[in-house]
């Protein structure tokens, strides 16, 4: 696999650099008079969406500069599924910045390492290795599970990822198991879970904050923009002329509540970047394939997010 991360990195740095200007204009302070009303109205819309769709919906919106928020079930825990792969790659990039790993470092693997869903690693298994950068790109853009497990092996496993989340100030998000076991989360099980509010805050730290260098942030954002799995979710509801990147997560089986997740950063043309974390548990238990009507719930969340950002 030939990675194009160096070429795309330059394109991604422009919106990241623009965050500082918005911080100066906004004074890093939300409008105390209008924010609560907007947040309450948005929370009501999200609650109404959940009632119409059935199931359980958790959402958090976060203005990356002012800190303005809106949420529904923002503090409740939800299974991350593959949404963990975006912050996982941030942990890898932190290790690169610290000299512990290199972007072009080859990571060996073989047929025995391949999981059921491994589109990129399977296509390249004959080469015997992929680079760290290629694995990050694969696990974000296609949600390649083998790539995620190989990356976890470089940082001390799930516990290593969780330690870095804590170092970045996230006391909620936790990764406990590898793919695919980490998707098996039942009610009351805190393993491999996050809350929408915690995830939105973590995204703020790694995508627009100072947790990573501008170059690393640009890589993460660019891979999110290139993601191929989220076109029917948040990005389907966000305006097409807003630059948006996301990472999906899905857990669908014959004997578990189906999970449809998506986390995103989006760039309104007249405002600072907005972080979105959306986690949806479908009322359908027995489905063994993704349902468009469940993904449409997240598309509606995207539309609500756009209106909230504009207001």
Language-model features and meaning:
Residues 67, 79-107, 276:
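Active-site SXXK
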């Amino acid at each position: 696999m030939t990675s194009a991360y160096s070429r795309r990195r330059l394109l991604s740095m422009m919106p990241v650099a623009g965050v500082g200007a918005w911080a100066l204009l906004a004074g890093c302070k939300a409008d105390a008079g209008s924010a609560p009303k907007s947040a309450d109205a948005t929370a009501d819309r999200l609650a109404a969406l959940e009632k119409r769709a059935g199931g359980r919906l958790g959402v958090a919106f976060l203005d990356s500069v002012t800190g303005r928020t809106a949420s529904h079930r923002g503090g409740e825990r939800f299974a991350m599924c593959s949404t963990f792969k975006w912050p996982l790659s941030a942990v890898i990039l932190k290790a690169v910045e610290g000299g512990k790993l290199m972007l072009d470092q080859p990571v060996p693997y073989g047929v025995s390492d391949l999981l059921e869903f491994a589109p990129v690693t399977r296509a390249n298994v004959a080469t015997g290795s992929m680079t760290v950068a290629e694995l990050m790109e694969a696990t974000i853009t296609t949600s390649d599970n083998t790539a995620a497990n190989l990356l976890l092996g470089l940082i001390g496993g799930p516990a290593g990822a969780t330690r870095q989340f804590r170092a970045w100030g996230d006391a909620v998000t936790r990764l406990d198991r590898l793919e695919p076991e980490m998707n098996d989360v039942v009610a009351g099980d805190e393993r491999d879970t996050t809350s929408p509010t915690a995830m939105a805050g973590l995204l703020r730290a790694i995508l627009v904050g100072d947790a990573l260098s501008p170059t690393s942030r640009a890589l993460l954002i660019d891979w999110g923009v290139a993601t191929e799995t989220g076109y029917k979710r948040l990005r389907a509801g966000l305006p097409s002329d807003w630059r948006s990147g996301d990472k999906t997560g899905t857990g669908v089986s014959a004997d578990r509540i189906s999970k449809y997740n998506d986390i995103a950063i989006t760039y309104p043309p007249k405002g600072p970047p907005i972080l979105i974390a959306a986690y949806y548990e479908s009322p359908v238990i027995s489905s063994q394939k993704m349902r468009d009507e469940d993904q449409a719930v997240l598309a509606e969340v995207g539309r609500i997010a756009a209106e909230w950002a504009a207001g």
